[in-house]
């Protein structure tokens, strides 16, 4: 699914971004969001 990381949680590398939910590791109860446009831009956000 899609995700946004401008206001939903602490950014890991680059923010803001819009992307897709990745299966990468974040803390329990959080999910990783990876940017559509940059392979290194990602963040963790609280699961909805």
Swiss-Prot record:
Entry's Gene Ontology BP terms: regulation of signal transduction
InterPro entries reported for this sequence: Anenome_toxin, Myo_ane_neurotoxin_sf
Main location: secreted
Keyword rRNA processing recorded: no
One Gene Ontology term of the molecular function aspect: toxin activity
Location in or out of the cell: Secreted; Nematocyst
Origin: domain of life: Eukaryota
Pfam families noted in UniProt: Toxin_4
Misc note: The C-terminal lysine was not positively identified.
Role, per record: Binds specifically to voltage-gated sodium channels (Nav), thereby delaying their inactivation during signal transduction. Its toxicity is greater than that of RpII (AC P01534).
Protein name: Delta-stichotoxin-Hmg4b
């Amino acid at each position: 699914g899609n995700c946004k990381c401008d206001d939903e949680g602490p950014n890991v590398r680059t923010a803001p971004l819009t992307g897709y939910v990745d299966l990468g590791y974040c803390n329990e109860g959080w999910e990783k969001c990876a940017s559509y446009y940059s392979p290194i831009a990602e963040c963790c956000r609280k699961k909805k």
